[in-house]
């Protein structure tokens, strides 16, 4: 049998309102249906990319309360952030995987 990993990206680049609990619920539904990894970007409440990890950490905490999906944080996306700001999600212990676009 071929092994596969299903990764979900529950927040679109066009999403303008970020709700950590709603994202976690969506991730949980995906997990129940076979997803094993979630791809998240670090965004503020208005959907803009940000180096502030507080909402992302809150979102991951809610996800962890519901399921044991692998959390992969992206440093990518088109933004005005510096490379130093973009790599901030690589450091927290609650992040299991990263994608890094340089």
For the regions a protein language model found, what residue spans apply to each?
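Hydrophobic faces of well-ordered beta-strands that scaffold small-molecule active sites
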Residues: 4-10, 38-40, 69-75, 96-100
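Active-site mouth loops of central-metabolism enzymes
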Residues: 7-25, 74-83
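Glycine-rich, proline-tolerant flexible connector loops at the mouths of alpha/beta enzymes
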Residues: 34-59
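Active-site neighborhood of glycoside hydrolase catalytic domains
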Residues: 61-71
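Extended substrate/RNA-proximal surfaces in nucleic-acid metabolism proteins
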Residues: 80-102
């Amino acid at each position: 049998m071929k092994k596969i990993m299903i990764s979900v990206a529950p927040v679109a680049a066009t999403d303008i309102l970020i709700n950590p609990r709603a994202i976690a619920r969506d991730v949980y539904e995906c997990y129940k249906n076979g997803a094993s990894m979630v791809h998240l970007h670090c965004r503020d409440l208005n959907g803009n990319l940000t180096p502030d990890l507080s909402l992302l950490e809150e979102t991951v905490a809610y996800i962890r309360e519901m399921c044991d999906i692998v959390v992969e944080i992206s440093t990518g996306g088109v933004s005005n952030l510096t490379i130093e700001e973009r790599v901030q999600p690589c450091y927290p212990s609650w992040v299991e995987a990263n994608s890094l676009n340089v």
